[in-house]
Structure formats: C-alpha cells, structure tokens
Amino acid sequence: MSVVPVADVLQGRVAVDQEVTVRGWVRTRRDSKAGISFLAVYDGSCFDPVQAVINNSLPNYNDDVLHLTTGCSVIVTGVVVASPGQGQSFELQATAIEVTGWVEDPDTYPMAAKRHSIEYLREVAHLRPRTNMIGAVARVRHTLAQALHRFFDEQGYFWVSTPLITASDTEGAGEMFRVSTLDLENLPRTPEGKVDFDKDFFGKEAFLTVSGQLNGETYACALSKIYTFGPTFRAENSNTSRHLAEFWMLEPEVAFANLNDVAGLAEAMLKYVFKAVLEERADDMKFFAERVDSDAVARLERFVSADFAQVDYTDAVAILEKCGEKFENPVYWGVDLSSEHERYLAEKHFKAPVVVKNYPKDIKAFYMRLNEDGKTVAAMDVLAPGIGEIIGGSQREERLDVLDARMEEMGLNPADYSWYRDLRRYGTVPHSGFGLGFERLIAYVTGVQNVRDVIAFPRTPRNASF
C-alpha cells in the first residue's frame, strides 16, 4: 500500500479509485445518524485536511473511531473518490484506520478545535505548529528559503557558511551577546581589575555574530559572488513587533560590483521569491488573504509587476520636509529615516518599492564606501509599501586609508580588524552587498504583524523558553 501526503490526494496527483494510506492528525470528527463518521485529517503537507469517510462496518469503529478527538494521530487507508461535498475535490473512503496516539485529556488539550489568540499561541510554541496559521507560516517560510537558494544558485552564487561565534562587531554598535565559559562566581582578573578574557575558551572576548557580512566579504574577494544565510543575534533590548534577539539573515556579497549593481540584484531577488510563493503556496496565501491580511496576495502581485523607484537620501528628506504630513519623528538632513518616513515614501509619494541611496556617513557603519562629497556613503535601503525598510546594503569601502580613517572616527581599533584590512592590502576590488532580515520578509509576505509569529521559537528580551 503506497503512503502518500495529503497534498497529493487533494491536488489530484493520486488516481481516483486508487487505494492509498495517509498518516496525520485529526483536526475534527463529526458523526452522522447513518453510522458514518467524517474525519478531517491533516499532515502538514498542505493547508487543507483530507476528509476520510468512515463507515461503522469497520471493526474498530465503536472502540476507536467514535473516541477520536482533535490532535489524535492516525493512519488511514482508503480509496480516493471524487468528493460530492463542497470544499474539496477528493476524499478517502476509509477501508482501515489505526490510531497511533491518543490525546490524554481532550478537555484540557491546549490546541482544542477553536480559534486561539496569537498571544496564547506564543505560550504554547511547541504546539502552535498544529494551528492553521502557524502551519501556513512554516510552509511559506520553507518556500521562501528554497526560492532564495534557488535564485542565487541560478545566478552563479556560492553559499558560504560563516561563523556564529566571532570576535568582530560588524555593525560597531556593541549590542552583542558574549560567549564565555568563565566561572561567573570566580572570574579571572587582570592587574587592572578587568575580566581577563585571555583565560577564556577562545583566549579573547568572543560574541555571537550580528552579521556574516565581514566574513562573507573574504569569500566574495575570492569566489566573486557569494551569499550567507543563517542565524544572527542582537542583544538589543527592544520589545517591538519588528525585533528578535535571534533571527535569520540573508547576505549576498559581490566582487567588482557597485551600489547600483546590488540595488538591481535586490529587486530581481525579491520579485523572484514573491512570484515563487504566489505560485507554490497558493493555498496558504489564500488563507492569509482571508484571515490575516486581505491585501496579502494583491500586495505581492503589485510588487512583482512594479518598477522600483530610486531616490537619493537628500532628495528623500526634501520630499518629506515639503509633503505637509505630520510625522511623529521630525525629519531633517542627517537623521535616520524612521518607519513612518519610509512608509510615506513607498506608499504615498512613489506608490511603489523605493531604493533610497547615499545616506549621511554619521548614521551608517564604518565599512560603507565614502562618497566623493565626504559627507555621505554609498548605502541603500529598499523600502516596501506596507512595511518600510526590507533590505539594507552598501558598497563596501575598498580603500585601506579611507577604511582606517572611518574606523578611527568611530572609535574602532584597526588591530581588531587586521584580517578584514588585509582584503584591502592584497588585490582590493570594489565590492558590494546587502542584508535581508528573513523574518521581516516572511511577515511582509504573510501579513502577520509580529515577527515573533513567523519564527519557530522566538528569542526576545527575558524570553528564551522551549
């Protein structure tokens, strides 16, 4: 007997009258007076469950079937038939059913068949994948990740796995998690009374990475086109719907590329993955449009067909100053654009995705290439209608003397970045890249308002459960 996913049955990939087996969990059970039970069985392979029609002639009908409740795990064998009812094209006429796991107490089962609040689901994160929404998020997350890998592979990029433990602060902001095996009750001290990290596991201070970019640059300067994709960490005490202490980042780096090159790459990449999710996860996206955000599908369709606008930071500030809109955060040249500024530009002024370029150097990182005006750097943000910034990137500073001067300006010790400086000493090239926060991308695609609900087990200030 062939075991098939529920998706194959519902999507017509199994011939009518063929007997197959599906394995999954009961979503609902209803019984008719005619001695027939209808089980909705899901296995996570698609959004909808398959209906299994079970006749009371089965030998374990009274002992097992009539006691099944939401969450019980079952193996159902049956014949695929065209469904006479609404809601599905095919169903199973069961010939056998095996219960592999019961729910101990249906009355206290945390995932009972009713709508649960998002806040409640975070408290039972180990069970929330069983819900419609989190299951759909998981499938969309998978499809987006696979589409990103596929896009870069087709473009000739190599995936590089950069370290999670580092001694470098990529952003220079100092919001890093320290990694240490020192005894907190008996810390070694230097003669000056400071913690002696020479005695630590790595012989120096070590941290969880905030970005794979610096390491990625080393491989871009040898393989030409690379990308990193993995977890990153920020010890930022932010309890907002847009922040996580642990999240995933995608970061391409391209040798011999300028800012315009990677702006074009970002546009092509986003359109590629949005098109993929619309085509491959139509069932889940239909759910998000019906239950979470009515604009979810239409937003992506508009994005895929839109031409990106491009504007210099200086011109963007002028637009915002003259627009007559009352902003909560004042806007002037030299300030970093807030979410409300970004969304005004994308949603009201340009009515399209926008690439803002050439930001003031004082609000950007040390590694961004200084422009000829000496005041701005070759940095960019991609702003999307409905969310604001979705990508941040830059051309990297390839001139050693300028890089050293920028480090000095920002109080960084060049000795801590000797290996990074070597890239400028041995065959330096112009190169550029960007970073995409994966959870923000998923939130944008699905319309889910909080990034805590698009990652399996969110890590936030004072929360590291599960």
Swiss-Prot record:
It comes from the Bacteria. Keywords: Aminoacyl-tRNA synthetase, ATP-binding, Cytoplasm, Ligase, Nucleotide-binding, Protein biosynthesis. Its EC number is 6.1.1.22. One of its GO terms (molecular function) is nucleic acid binding. It catalyses: tRNA(Asn) + L-asparagine + ATP = L-asparaginyl-tRNA(Asn) + AMP + diphosphate + H(+). Coiled coil: none annotated. GO terms for biological process: asparaginyl-tRNA aminoacylation. The keyword Protein biosynthesis applies. InterPro entries: Aa-tRNA-synt_II (IPR004364), aa-tRNA-synth_II (IPR006195), aa-tRNA-synth_II/BPL/LPL (IPR045864), Asn-tRNA-ligase (IPR004522), Asp/Asn-tRNA-synth_IIb (IPR002312), NA-bd_OB-fold (IPR012340), NA-bd_OB_tRNA (IPR004365). SUPFAM superfamilies: Class II aaRS and biotin synthetases, Nucleic acid-binding proteins. It is an enzyme of class 6 (ligase). HAMAP family: Asn_tRNA_synth (MF_00534). PANTHER family: ASPARAGINE--TRNA LIGASE, MITOCHONDRIAL-RELATED, ASPARTYL/LYSYL-TRNA SYNTHETASE. Homodimer. Belongs to the class-II aminoacyl-tRNA synthetase family. This is Asparagine--tRNA ligase. It comes from Enterobacter sp. (strain 638). The gene is asnS.
